[in-house]
Amino acid sequence: MAVLAALLSGCMSLSGERRTVSAPVATSGPDSTVFAEQTRLVATFGGEYAAPAPLIDLVREIVAKIVAASDDPAVRYRVTVLNSPSINAFALPTGDLYVTRGLLALANDTSELAAVLAHEVGHVTAKHASQRAEFERQATTAMPDSISGPNGAASRFLLASFSRGQELEADEVGIRTIAKAGYDPYGAARFLASLARQTTFVGEIRPSARYSFLSSHPSTPQRLAAALETARANVGATSIEADRARYLTALSGIAYGDDPFGGVVRGRRFLHARLDFMMLAPEGFVLENSPQAVIGVTGNGQEALRLDTVRLGGAGPEAALAGGWIDGATNSEITPFSINGLSGATATAKGPEWTFRLAAIQKGEDIFRIIFAAREMTPVLDRTFLASIGSFRTLTSDEKLGLRPQRLETVAAGGDDTAMTLLTKSDRADNALDRFLVLNGLDRPKIRAGELYKLILSE
């Protein structure tokens, strides 16, 4: 497994104004080990995101209110918005809080976002983040060097979940804090419900989707029931309606979905506007994009894919393959090929537990490295890998046009509007109604005149 982990967590890049939000509140001493990983962690999530100015101001206000109402108001918290469509938020013991633009897009009022941020503050004040950092240090010490890399620690951080008890404790602390700060204590339960809807929706269209907020912050019935009970004990907050209108107004214009600059996943296809290429993964693979690489896995975990790019100072595909990409694996004879006007080379490699189909394709100065791994390689499976490699090509004009960046815009519903009439103003997409309901926190397509709703538009 160490070899496969190295394959999936390596750090070569396929990758483009950034802003950090600070609450004006003295700082406890940072954990130097965790602090050293912050840059790598941010890079793993696509770097910092320059959110719309009204949203930045609102987040700053929310953080300041939460800190003032928290159990330790002397700690300074800094919130960084990450340029990732995934739904995630996490805290470091330094007081650094991270939230993805994907999570901001899912929230529907200031109380929901306050609940997420207060939950993470709860992890810090309860020392959960320090305990998780210690776990990470131990994992780093025990992990073979072959898995380590510039983004290795960040990847392991993502996999270190808080315990169920810690999650419930952070929920309770967070709900109590937002109520004290003047926010609706039921915001936490609403956001947990939205997370559950999102998980159901994503699970239907991408069954193996990973690394969401839910993977480390599960929205279990027990957790939702506990959140509702805690909220009932802390009633007395501001108007939900006012919170929703203000939040959605500030949110309008935020980027939505994959950043075309770093490539986008469309089912089994991966398309990259800047690098001008696409590739089709085999049937059964679910793709996940990151700034470092495209990763693909099958539902049973028996096959995997990695695609990244390097520049080797003029070396061609055969020379690139000759360098050896898999520790502990022996390459077969290298075979050159030509596909879609591009030159490439391929080989197989055999490791103790996995067999690999390797390919290098040259496009301009870039060498694209494609690695397929299988626990049990068969001739039929190898042919499907080769067919996928053969799908690598430059983009068509229509494909480039379809890769325009998307954003969320909020619109007020008219008296005659329905969910379907609102969707006529949005980009056409598969599962459009279901996505609309999830984004707007709705169980059913019932629209209220004058209320704001999120729509997805292309730039």
Cite the ranges covered by each PLM segment.
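A Zn2+-metalloprotease active-site environment signal
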Residues: 1, 11-252, 256-272, 278-280, ...
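Short, well-ordered beta-strand elements
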Residues: 306-309, 365-376
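Signature of long, low-cysteine stretches enriched in small and polar/charged residues
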Residues: 322-371
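Extended non-catalytic domains of envelope/secretory-pathway proteins
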Residues: 284-286, 294-297, 322-336, 341, ...
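Extracellular LysM carbohydrate-binding repeats and other cell-envelope/extracellular binding modules
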Residues: 431-459
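Primarily a LysM-type cell-wall glycan-binding module
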Residues: 397-430
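Surface-exposed amphipathic alpha-helical segments
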Residues: 114, 285, 370-410
